Amino acid sequence: MDEEVVGQIGQGLMVLVGITHDDTEDDAAYLADKVVNLRIFDDSEGKMNLSLVDIGGEILSVSQFTLYGDTKKGRRPNYMNAAKPDKALGLYEKWNDLLREKGIKVETGTFGAMMDVQLTNSGPVTLIMDSK
């Protein structure tokens, strides 16, 4: 992105969002609710017991079609399982809107652009979530 910062957050989550052909707004709603309420932040005793809502956290939402890369055959990933850009963009925007409706500050990258994304991963804690 030409060294321009287009999305940045403080404490919270970076969510890499992959969208496939049969994903729906119901899937986006389910995952938005799950992400903001999942108790994965430490409480005063160091136990994972607080949600993004509890800590007043933010989300950096990054569209990532490569999550649906299939590497079973050959030496180059096949991205046929990723939704086409027009569908993916609409559902990605809906996902971000649903998070904002829940009172979460959401920053995004630029959809479809090549970006350098930086992450400080405490723990590290990395989770894979799916609605199906």
Swiss-Prot record:
Give Gene Ontology CC terms.
Answer: cytoplasm
Q: Which Pfam families match?
A: Tyr_Deacylase
UniProt GO BP: D-amino acid catabolic process; tRNA metabolic process
Q: Which GO terms describe its molecular function?
A: D-tyrosyl-tRNA(Tyr) deacylase activity; Gly-tRNA(Ala) deacylase activity; Ser(Gly)-tRNA(Ala) hydrolase activity; tRNA binding
- Organism's domain of life? Bacteria
SUPFAM superfamilies reported for this sequence: DTD-like
The remark listed among the other comments is:
Culture in the presence of D-Leu, D-Met, D-Trp or D-Tyr leads to growth inhibition due to their incorporation into protein, as well as inhibition of biofilm formation. Partially contradictory results are seen in another study where growth occurs in the presence of 20 and 500 mg/ml D-Trp but not in 500 mg/ml D-Asp or D-Ser; whether these are the exact same strains is unknown.
Task: Write out the similarity annotation.
Answer: Belongs to the DTD family.
Q: What is this protein called?
A: Inactive D-aminoacyl-tRNA deacylase
Q: Which organism encodes this protein? A: Bacillus subtilis (strain 168)
Biological classification of the source: Bacteria, Bacillati, Bacillota, Bacilli, Bacillales
